[in-house]
Amino acid sequence: MPAIVLVGAQWGDEGKGKATDALGARVDYVVKFNGGNNAGHTVVVGDEKYALHLLPSGILTPGVTPVIGNGVVVDLSVLFEEIDALTARGVDCSKLLLSASAHVIAPYHRVLDQVTERFLGSRKIGTTGRGIGPTYADKINRIGIRVQDLFDESILRQKVEGALDQKNHLLLKVYNRRAVSVDETVENLLSFRDRIAPMVTDVSLELSRALDRDEIVLFEGGQATMLDIDHGTYPYVTSSNATAAGACTGAGIPPNRVDRIVAVVKAYTTRVGEGPFPTELLDADGEKLRQDGGEFGTTTGRPRRTGWYDAVISRYSARINGVTDFVLTKLDTLTGWERIPVCVAYDVDGVRHDEIPMSQSDFHHAKPIYEFFDGWTEDITGARSMEDLPKNAQAYVEALEAISGSRISAVGVGPDREQTVVRHDLLG
């Protein structure tokens, strides 16, 4: 089984880094295929905690080749900040591969992202302000800068000039900001050329050959299904395809090479930024989930919105992605609750919806219909099998599996790599 795709099933921050890292020692390549440094993941190895934003979490596993695919937008300054920080802590980053076709976040992309959000005011999307959306917009408008362009200064300058002809007019006339210098932008981008040269390659070809050798390739999705540009809660979404299909376009592999699709889902729900969230808790219960779960953004540090588990979203994710296995994370965060609600359907203006409403307006007005499950008080962080879990925790996991659309193959009971209950082999 050479290819496995790993995605988030909710609105991100599900613990994909932990799931990727748990698989990492058994795979040969870990490929990031979408997004940029707008999504962070934290991996705990022993007493060491690593916060990654752009690098694939497989970079922490010796022997694994980490890959950044063509579907990623790359802030080169952030890339080398992460590489240098990991190198200083003894992590070998020399095997990293970077697609020549990946698009580059230029300084003006960050500026435009930030001023646009401020300009929108109450209508803002809630971006991280890191230039992700503007870079993808340039890609679609065919005026983007790719990694390979850094190796031809004349082409690079031509592209920067063409982009800034339009963007400086916008900055000056609409946003009342100063113009961005072509020379400074070109100089900034060229400063990274020598450092990226050893890692730049044809990622699609590299991965095709690896799969032909029956090596195991793990495709690691950024963000999550409900933030997908096409299938998420538009317009409150990211700018890339964060569903399993994005692995094919974002890394250059055909769909028939993918053998298994794993979706990571929290035992409750969180969201960062604007947009609908039917099970959101705006009271003391929501704050307790936030504090107990450490729900503060890896990238931004801002508090995450919290709510109960939403099986409607899980079923949707299972269908959209073709999920073969779920990994349930942060079950330990629910320890101590007397009763745990689970959303099994929505009420929209008196009508029951077992699936996500088609219209944005209906989704905004959706009210959760809950079933309730008995909680537990026992410490579960030492559990390594289902039998180690309290009966009520076992019943909760089994209930989520029954209503979520696919089997739950692993359960996270703590932040460490070893704190996982494995029910089914994800690679078997």
Swiss-Prot record:
One of its GO terms (cellular component) is cytoplasm. Pfam families: Adenylsucc_synt. Pathway: Purine metabolism; AMP biosynthesis via de novo pathway; AMP from IMP: step 1/2. Substrate binds at T298, T299, T300, G301, R302, P303, R304. GO terms for biological process: 'de novo' AMP biosynthetic process; IMP metabolic process. GO terms for molecular function: adenylosuccinate synthase activity; GTP binding; magnesium ion binding. It is found in: Cytoplasm. Binds 1 Mg(2+) ion per subunit. The active site is at D13, H41. It catalyses: IMP + L-aspartate + GTP = N(6)-(1,2-dicarboxyethyl)-AMP + GDP + phosphate + 2 H(+). Keywords: Cytoplasm, GTP-binding, Ligase, Magnesium, Metal-binding, Nucleotide-binding, Purine biosynthesis. GTP binds at residues 12-18, 40-42, 304, 330-332, 412-414. Its EC number is 6.3.4.4. It is an enzyme of class 6 (ligase). IMP binds at D13, E14, G15, K16, N38, A39, G40, H41, T128, R142, Q223, T238, R302. Its main location: cytoplasm. Coiled coil: none annotated. Signal peptide: none annotated. Homodimer. HAMAP family: Adenylosucc_synth. Plays an important role in the de novo pathway of purine nucleotide biosynthesis. Catalyzes the first committed step in the biosynthesis of AMP from IMP. This is Adenylosuccinate synthetase. The lineage of its organism: Bacteria, Bacillati, Actinomycetota, Actinomycetes, Kineosporiales. The gene is purA.
